[in-house]
Structure formats: structure tokens, C-alpha cells
């Protein structure tokens, strides 16, 4: 069973390995610094998908308001580690974000 939660700055250490998988050329300190800065932006949200207590997916997004559609969330990244890909977890994470929004 998987669970969904909004991630906070307390989760940065758990998020870093997934971002490293997406961007292996970055170093941990840069990722941590960038992530801390993003968490400080009021319209930023970060979402996690957990299998038991293990973070198996992360996505982030920006809450915006558009003249043509009103309030929305613009998803920035969806990261599912290679070991969990092709099992529907990415789709499930997007669906859970849609339900949250």
C-alpha cells in the first residue's frame, strides 16, 4: 500500500537521493540548498509517495492563478526511482496531487 503526503523542509534528506537520480551531476549540498530555498517560497509545494515508510516518488509544483482558469497547480517534476518505475506509481502520484488540488 502507498501513502501520499505533503513534504516539508524536514524531509529534505529523504528527497535528495531521488533528485540525485534525476540529476546525478548535482551535488548533495546544492540540492539541499535549492530545496531549502524552494520550500521558502509561499506558492511552492512538494509531494511524496511512500511505500511503507520508504519515499518512492516525489513531485513538486507551484500554485498559480491564471485569468483563463483561476487557481491551479503547475507540476514541475515527477521523480520515481528506476527500481519503482513502470509500476504505475508516477500515475498514482499525479492522481493524488490532482485529488489534493
Residue ranges and their predicted role:
Residues 1-15:
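A short beta-loop-alpha structural element at the N-terminal edge
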Residues 2, 53-58, 73:
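Glycine-rich phosphate/pyrophosphate-binding loop shared by adenosine-nucleotide-utilizing enzymes
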Residues 14-18, 33, 54, 92, ...:
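Alpha-helical elements of Rossmann-like donor-binding domains used by nucleotide-donor carbohydrate transfer enzymes
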Residues 16-37:
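Conserved GNAT-fold acetyl-CoA-binding loop/helix
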Residues 36-48, 57, 74:
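A short helix-loop-beta-strand connector motif used in the catalytic cores of GNAT acetyltransferases and
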Residues 48, 54-64, 79:
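Conserved beta-strand in the GNAT
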Residues 64-75, 85:
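A conserved beta-turn-beta hairpin within the catalytic core of GNAT-like acetyltransferases
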Residues 80, 86-99:
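Conserved acetyl-CoA-binding loop-helix of GNAT-fold acetyltransferases
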Amino acid at each position: 500500500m502507498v501513502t501520499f503526503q505533503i513534504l516539508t523542509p524536514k524531509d529534505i534528506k529523504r528527497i535528495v537521493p531521488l533528485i540525485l537520480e534525476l540529476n546525478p551531476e548535482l551535488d548533495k549540498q546544492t540540492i539541499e540548498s535549492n530545496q531549502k530555498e524552494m520550500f521558502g517560497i509561499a506558492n511552492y509545494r512538494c509531494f511524496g509517495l511512500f511505500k511503507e515508510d520508504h519515499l518512492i516518488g516525489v513531485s513538486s509544483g507551484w500554485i498559480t492563478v491564471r485569468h483563463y482558469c483561476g487557481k491551479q497547480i503547475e507540476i514541475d517534476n515527477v521523480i520515481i526511482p528506476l527500481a519503482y518505475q513502470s509500476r504505475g506509481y508516477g500515475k498514482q502520484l499525479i492522481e493524488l496531487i490532482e485529488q489534493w488540488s
